[in-house]
């Protein structure tokens, strides 16, 4: 039933929802980690507040970017292939990891991050419990 509902929703809508949720979580992480990092480097007052605001924006943007790229790639592949399996998660994770690491311009980091995000994506996809006989 849920699969039928998801197939009726456009990929762009799923991507926007994913970006908003995960970017909010990233912003909250930046709100928690920003003051600690500011104290570590000895900031206080207005400079600390500025650092925290930048941390919120940076973490929110990075998390939203990864989420958006992954969701759009995963959904697009799912629609193109007509299957919802680990291959979609593998490719989506690789593309999302590469998109984040490309700013370093270090190909070792790009490949490493693509592999890491891809592995976590496949692991998350494989650990989902889907029982087709469940009537709940």
From Swiss-Prot:
GO molecular function, one term: porin activity
Subcellular location: Plastid, Chloroplast outer membrane
Keyword Protein transport: no
Region (Contains 4 beta strands): 1-59
First-listed, main subcellular location of the protein, grouped into a coarse class: plastid
Annotated TM spans: 18-34, 56-72, 86-102, 110-126
Keywords: Chloroplast, Ion transport, Membrane, Plastid, Plastid outer membrane, Porin, Transmembrane, Transmembrane beta strand, Transmembrane helix, Transport
Keyword NADP among UniProt keywords: no
One GO biological process term: monoatomic ion transport
Protein name: Outer envelope pore protein 16-4, chloroplastic
């Amino acid at each position: 039933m849920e699969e039928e509902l998801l197939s009726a929703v456009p990929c762009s809508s799923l991507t926007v929802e994913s970006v908003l949720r995960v970017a909010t979580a990233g912003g909250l992480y930046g709100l928690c980690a920003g003051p600690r990092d500011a104290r570590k480097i000895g900031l206080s007052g207005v400079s600390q507040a500025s650092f925290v605001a930048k941390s919120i924006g940076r973490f929110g943007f990075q998390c939203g970017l990864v989420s958006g790229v992954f969701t759009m790639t995963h959904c697009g592949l799912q629609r193109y292939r007509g299957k919802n399996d680990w291959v979609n998660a593998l490719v989506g994770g690789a593309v999302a990891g590469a998109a984040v690491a490309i700013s370093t311009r270090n190909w070792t980091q790009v490949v490493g991050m693509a592999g890491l995000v891809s592995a976590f994506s496949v692991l998350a996809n494989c650990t989902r419990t889907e029982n087709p006989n469940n009537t709940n």
